[in-house]
Amino acid sequence: MNIAVVGLSHRTAPVEVREKLSISDDNIPSAFNTLNTNDQIIEVSILSTCNRLEIYSFVKNSDNGVKAIKDFLCKHSGLGIDELDPHLFSYDQAEAVKHVMRVAGGLDSLVLGEGQILSQVKKMVRLGQENHSMGPILNRLLTQAVSTGKRVRSETNLGTGAVSISSAAVELAQLKLGQSEGKDELMSLEREKVSIVGAGRMSRLLIQHLQSKGCSKLKLINRTFQRAEALALDFPDVDIHCQLLDDLDESLRNSTLIFTSTAAENPIIDAARLKEVVRDETLRLIDIGVPRNISSDVKGLTGFEAHDVDDLQEVVSRNQEARQQIALEAEALVDEEGRIFLEWWASLEAVPTINLLRSSLESVRKEELQKALSRMGPDFSARERKVVEALSKGIINKILHTPVTNLRAPQTSSNRKISLEVIETLFELGVSESE
């Protein structure tokens, strides 16, 4: 049995591939159900974000477990294994453990040190527990990954000043505005006519960053008016005009900058729609949705400038170099947490022997206690019987403490195996026969 992770990310696959594997919140239970019924998979959890889809698992056999997960991904995405496999990565054992620690710490993110991934890993843990897909191994691994992410942010400066996907999108808009004026600098968005499509968490972050860059007025477009208004009320210093998605064409005609961030599974803006829009100036569209909210056929369309999450790399690379040294400190924390987990996992090898040893000594204790109590006669009170029984239990616990502690202590697999064999032989435990 082993720990394995299979997935893809912005490092291995373009957005047009990632969006085909994205699993929406509505489809998560169905995905868990499919994976849970596979006889190769013992425990499983799913991490699905705009930049990655990763499936963490505890499997009977690494090769068979990885194949089962790849088969699921092919069926889910509609891609053949020959199309999908070049974009997938898979790790097992220590590599899988280190990977999830790095992910939670923000070290594998498009934006180094970004904080949103930690919330997404927490959500992965919650969803795995709610869908009864995680057992003791993944529970321990993923909760420790969350702790690692918190340590990285509290014990290093990696999270300080880190940009997020939303802030990178705003900076990309500033950069492209500057480039359109022949300047390689971030321009103020104060005079831009801004619209945001979507009223979720990413849109909230967009408004925060736009406000900090001089934007004091914008349109917020959503499928439901109520959710848009609720978000607008949280920003009293920004003049936010709410509209329904049905009125999107009006914003396509009158805005100069539109951000899209909805959970729609299909594009809401495509070339056919934009060709019907009459404009006097270029409309800049920045899509941070996965699956994409803006169709790929918009790129290259005259009068429109479209960008997706993969284009954020242009902004991110401007901020990364100064953070690399801090990242080395975070990597050291990740290595430390990885070792702690692997030592715990290795110690589980001793559990069957420890349980049999405890059971064997407990049988002896009960037998000898019964003999002693029978010799005490009827004059021996119930209180005195409880004292003697507690004494016998205390003796057993004292005897077990040192060997159990030593068996669970960090050591090489070969040394632990020798210790287990010695105890099994001396106490005639017969572990191999019982398994």
From Swiss-Prot:
GO biological process: chlorophyll biosynthetic process; protoporphyrinogen IX biosynthetic process
Binding annotation for NADP(+): 198-203
GO molecular function, one term: glutamyl-tRNA reductase activity
This protein's pathway: Porphyrin-containing compound metabolism; protoporphyrin-IX biosynthesis; 5-aminolevulinate from L-glutamyl-tRNA(Glu): step 1/2; Porphyrin-containing compound metabolism; chlorophyll biosynthesis
Stored CDD domains: NAD_bind_Glutamyl_tRNA_reduct
Domain of life: Bacteria
InterPro entries per UniProt: 4pyrrol_synth_GluRdtase, 4pyrrol_synth_GluRdtase_dimer, 4pyrrol_synth_GluRdtase_N, GluRdtase_CS, GluRdtase_dimer_dom_sf, GluRdtase_N_sf, NAD(P)-bd_dom_sf, Shikm_DH/Glu-tRNA_Rdtase
Annotated Pfam families: GlutR_dimer, GlutR_N, Shikimate_DH
Active site: 50 (nucleophile)
Keywords: Chlorophyll biosynthesis, NADP, Oxidoreductase, Porphyrin biosynthesis
Site (Important for activity): 99
Annotated catalysed reactions: (S)-4-amino-5-oxopentanoate + tRNA(Glu) + NADP(+) = L-glutamyl-tRNA(Glu) + NADPH + H(+)
EC number(s) reported in the record: 1.2.1.70
Record-listed substrate binding positions: 49-52, 109, 114-116, 120
Oligomer status and interactors: Homodimer.
Miscellaneous section: During catalysis, the active site Cys acts as a nucleophile attacking the alpha-carbonyl group of tRNA-bound glutamate with the formation of a thioester intermediate between enzyme and glutamate, and the concomitant release of tRNA(Glu). The thioester intermediate is finally reduced by direct hydride transfer from NADPH, to form the product GSA.
Biological role: Catalyzes the NADPH-dependent reduction of glutamyl-tRNA(Glu) to glutamate 1-semialdehyde (GSA).
Family: Belongs to the glutamyl-tRNA reductase family.
Domain topic, free-text comment: Possesses an unusual extended V-shaped dimeric structure with each monomer consisting of three distinct domains arranged along a curved 'spinal' alpha-helix. The N-terminal catalytic domain specifically recognizes the glutamate moiety of the substrate. The second domain is the NADPH-binding domain, and the third C-terminal domain is responsible for dimerization.
Protein name: Glutamyl-tRNA reductase
Native source organism of the sequence: Prochlorococcus marinus (strain MIT 9211)
